[in-house]
Design a protein with these regions (language model features):
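Localized chelating/binding microdomains
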Residues: 1-3, 22, 96, 116-119, ...
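NAD(P)+-binding Rossmann beta1-loop-alpha1 motif at the extreme N-terminus of oxidoreductases
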Residues: 1-50
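Hydrophobic anchor at the start of a short beta-strand
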Residues: 3, 25-26, 45, 84, ...
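Hydrophobic Val/Ile/Leu positions in short beta-strands of Rossmann-like dinucleotide-binding domains
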Residues: 3-5, 63, 129
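Rossmann-like NAD(P)(H) cofactor-binding subdomain of soluble oxidoreductases
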Residues: 33, 38-119
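Internal alpha-helical scaffold of NAD(P)-dependent oxidoreductase catalytic cores
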Residues: 35, 39-42, 119-165, 169-206
Length: 219
């Protein structure tokens, strides 16, 4: 499959590196040409920093930018990509944000936390797809199956609910870890002493009902 990536951050980088083994990354577009060039070099793609340079001869365009920038990016590329399937990677953004500018709109959402220095176990990462046209579902399923064994067709409402839960399970939990580290750092206590507790808590939460595993107050 021929794919154009818009964005050169964490999600775009991980997607590009994972997809390049089975697909062709045609272009990487970023407002920062240096960032586009850095990622494009890794996946043998063309780096561009202007929407006027977009090549319409692609099967799919993946917008992997911040949630706040999706609508603006979608509108800016619309005059140059009139026939392409355009998807975003956001969990909290409705598909209608793209549908306002593109007849063929979709979502390709990986439920995962991304850091540039860490590899992703893509085969185990749930991928959630959605499309405005039925024919594009098959295209998204094909792409998702090339990465993961866990592919789901969710509506925007379902995906937004899942994203909210993910914020509690990931972002909020990590914030609590940071607070715990600040507490022990203040008294020169080794944070690694908490590692077994953190890991056991996570293991119990994934193997049992979390509510039943609460062993003490959270206040």
């Amino acid at each position: 499959m021929r794919i154009t990536l818009i964005g050169a951050g964490r999600v775009a980088t991980h997607l590009a590196l994972a997809l390049k083994t089975q697909h062709q990354i045609v272009q990487v577009l970023s407002r920062n040409l240096d960032h586009a060039q850095y990622l494009a070099h890794q996946v043998n793609a063309q780096a561009i920093d202007q929407v006027t340079q977009l090549n319409p001869q692609t099967d799919m365009v993946i917008i992997a930018v911040s949630d706040q920038a999706i609508a603006e990016v979608s509108e800016s590329i619309a005059p140059y990509l009139t026939e392409n399937l355009v998807v975003h990677t956001s969990g909290s953004t409705n598909i209608s944000v793209l549908g306002q500018s593109h007849q063929r709109a979709g979502v390709f959402y990986p439920l995962q936390t991304f850091s540039l220095e860490r590899e992703i176990a893509w085969q185990e990462t749930p991928l959630f797809i959605e499309a405005t046209l039925y024919k594009d579902i098959d295209l998204l399923i094909e792409l998702a199956n090339s990465l993961s064994n866990r592919v789901y067709h969710y509506s925007s409402k379902q995906r937004q609910t899942l994203h909210l839960a993910a914020v509690f399970a990931c972002n909020f939990s990590n914030y609590c870890y940071d607070m715990a580290k600040q507490v022990v750092d203040a008294e020169q206590v080794d944070f690694s002493l908490l590692y077994p507790l953190i890991l056991e808590t996570a293991n119990k939460a994934t193997q049992n009902e979390p509510k039943q595993m609460q062993t003490g107050p959270a206040m």
